[in-house]
């Protein structure tokens, strides 16, 4: 069995370099919620050095709230902003002799695109316009995955090690209790259940079906590195290969 392990990087946390030795894919902030040209360049350099797949992590224009504020923007605006961010990271990657592999939206752009078909379409269209060979990463079973498939893109369905799930397979909003799983054992158990058995227990106790093609590790958690190491060793024990 094989699984991709991804992390959101270039967001101002000190653990980036070490996380890049543990993950197989990196989603690099493109300046709209965090990061700038120099952090993008540094992250790309480290990712290439570690053989990690490079991806763009576009966001709503919302540095003040770290891209976590809901926005209602016209689809054409989202298309242009997404294309702008993807293009910037693609150029920085190419200049260093690397190849950009995927795109994963950030924060509320990701969450809204999981449920809003027009927004999902705008993002998928931007990815396709930039490079039809790019992989589009989205929440398992979401509108974003459906939109990517409609454009003929390769999609990668994502699950979260440290997030609570609702009965419909969507994430518990960060503003609500149960959104974040702080207990390491619980997060490990949830991850293995999703990867090995394709299901996750919701905060209300029901099982939801999920397709786990990539697991997200949040680099901003207090114990991010320790958990990443634990997850890697657990995967190794279970014969699960980590690869993009």
UniProtKB/Swiss-Prot annotation:
GO BP term, example: carbohydrate metabolic process
Highest taxon listed in the record's lineage: Bacteria
Keyword Cell inner membrane: no
Gene3D superfamilies: Glycoside hydrolase/deacetylase
Keywords of the record: ATP-binding, Hydrolase, Nucleotide-binding
GO terms, molecular function: 5-oxoprolinase (ATP-hydrolyzing) activity; ATP binding
Enzyme class: hydrolase
Reactions mediated catalytically: 5-oxo-L-proline + ATP + 2 H2O = L-glutamate + ADP + phosphate + H(+)
Its EC number(s): 3.5.2.9
UniProt subunit comment: Forms a complex composed of PxpA, PxpB and PxpC.
Physiological role: Catalyzes the cleavage of 5-oxoproline to form L-glutamate coupled to the hydrolysis of ATP to ADP and inorganic phosphate.
Family: Belongs to the LamB/PxpA family.
HAMAP family in the cross-refs: PxpA
Name used for this protein in its record: 5-oxoprolinase subunit A
Source organism per UniProt: Escherichia coli O17:K52:H18 (strain UMN026 / ExPEC)
């Amino acid at each position: 069995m094989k699984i991709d392990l991804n992390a959101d990087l270039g967001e101002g946390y000190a653990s980036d370099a070490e996380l890049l030795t543990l993950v197989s894919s990196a989603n690099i902030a493109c300046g709209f919620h965090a990061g700038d040209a120099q952090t993008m360049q540094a992250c790309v350099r480290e990712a290439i050095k570690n053989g990690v797949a490079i991806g763009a992590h576009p966001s709503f224009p919302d540095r003040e709230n770290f891209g976590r504020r809901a926005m209602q923007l016209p689809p054409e605006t989202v298309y242009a902003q997404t294309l702008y961010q993807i293009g910037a990271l693609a150029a920085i990657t190419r200049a260093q002799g690397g190849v950009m592999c995927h795109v994963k939206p950030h924060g509320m752009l990701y969450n809204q695109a999981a449920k809003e078909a027009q927004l999902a379409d705008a993002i998928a269209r931007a990815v396709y316009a930039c490079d039809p060979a790019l992989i589009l990463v989205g929440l398992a079973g979401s509108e974003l995955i459906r939109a990517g498939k409609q454009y003929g893109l390769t999609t990668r369905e994502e699950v979260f090690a440290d997030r609570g799930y609702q009965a419909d397979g969507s994430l518990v909003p960060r503003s609500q209790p149960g959104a974040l799983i702080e207990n390491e054992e619980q997060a490990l158990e949830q991850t293995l259940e999703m990867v090995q058995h394709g299901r996750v227990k919701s905060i209300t106790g029901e099982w939801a079906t999920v397709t786990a093609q990539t697991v997200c590790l949040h680099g901003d958690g207090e114990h991010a590195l320790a958990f990443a190491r634990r997850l890697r060793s657990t995967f190794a024990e279970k014969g699960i290969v980590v690869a993009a």
